[in-house]
Amino acid sequence: VSEAGFATMAEEWQQCLEASDANPLFMSWPWLYSWWETWSQVLGMELVLLGVFDEGGQLVGIGPFCRRILVTPARVRVARLYMLGNAWRLAPTVRTEYCEIIARRGYEENVRTEVVSALEHLKWDELICSDVPGNQLENLKAGGFDDQLNYRIIHRTEDIGIRIDTAGCFDRWLNALGRNTRLKTFNRRGYLRKLGELVFRDYDDSRDGDFFERLNAFHRARWGKPAFDREALRFHRLLLQRLDLCDGEAAMSLLLCNEECVSVLYDIVVRDCRYNLQAGYEEKFNTKVSLGYIHLGFAIEAAFRRERTNTYDLLAGTGKNEFYKSHFHGNAVHFSTFQVVRSPLLKALYNIQAASPPLVARAFSRRIGL
C-alpha cells in the first residue's frame, strides 16, 4: 500500500480492524497514520504497509511496517524494519503498545502466512517488534519465522501492563484493594474535602485553557522535562482530531482543590475500553496525599459508572518509585520487544555481543553501533 493509499484508507482500515482482535486504539488508522504523519520524515522512514485481500477484493489483513537504512559508527549498513508506531533505539516517539499484524477473524492463518511470505521477499537485515502482545512471536514462528529460515530471534525487553475489569461493581473492586492503596485512591478524598472544595471534572477547552500546557507544566516541575515534546504534541493533537474515525473520544479530566487545578489526567475511550495515556500533578501539594492516586481513583470510578466501559487500561510502564499499577487489582498484560535478525553479519556481531562480559558487550555495542 502506498503512502497516498495509507492516507485515504481510514474507512477500509477501520472495517478490517473492527472485524479483528487487534487493539482498537493503538492499531487504529487514527493512531498509526498520525504517528506516520508526525515522525516519518523526521526519522527518514520508508513506509512498508502490507495489505492482504480476499478473492473479492476485501481487505482482510494489514502488516503495518516501516523501514530505515542505518549506517552505524563502524560503517555497517543495516536495513531495519520496524512495526509502525515505534522507533526502537532510534528516537523517543510516543509509545505504541499492542503492536501486531491485523487480521479479520477467520483469516488469521492466511494473513499471517501472506505477511510473512511478503516480508521474506523484502530487503531487510533485521525486524524490530516492539511492545507486542505475548502471542505475536508464536504467530510469526507459525507463519514461518523460525529456524528453518535461519533467522535469529533476540529477546530484548519484557514489560507488564495492567487492565482493570470495570464491568462489575466499583465498591466491590474498591474493597478488594489493599488497605494502603484504598486509602490513597479513595479514602483520602475525605481528608482533602476538609481542606476545601474538591472537584473532579471533565476538561473543557473554552473554560480550562490548553490541556497539554497544563500537563507539560506539571511534568517539568516533577521530572525536569515536558511530558510531550513538539512532535509528540503534534501527534496527540492530530489523533484527537481523528478519534471519531475509530469510534473514540477524549476523556481528559482535571482535579481541582479550592478552584485550583492540582492534577490532570489524559485518557482516551475507544469501544469498551478507557486507556490511561498520561497524567501530571502537583507533587508537593500535600505530604499526606498522592494526587496521582486520587485522580486515578476518580477516573477508574468513572469507568465503572459508564455503562459501555468494561475495562480501564493502565498500559505498560512503571512509576517514579515503584510499579504502582500492580496495586490496582487488575489483570497483567505481557509485552515483548524482540529482534528478528536475517543478516549473517549482524548475527555474527550479536553473537559476539552475547558471548562477551557485560562491560565488554556494552563497549562493543557502542563502538559498532548496534
Regions found by a protein language model. Name each.
Residues 107-118, 287-301:
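Conserved acetyl-CoA-binding loop-helix of GNAT-fold acetyltransferases
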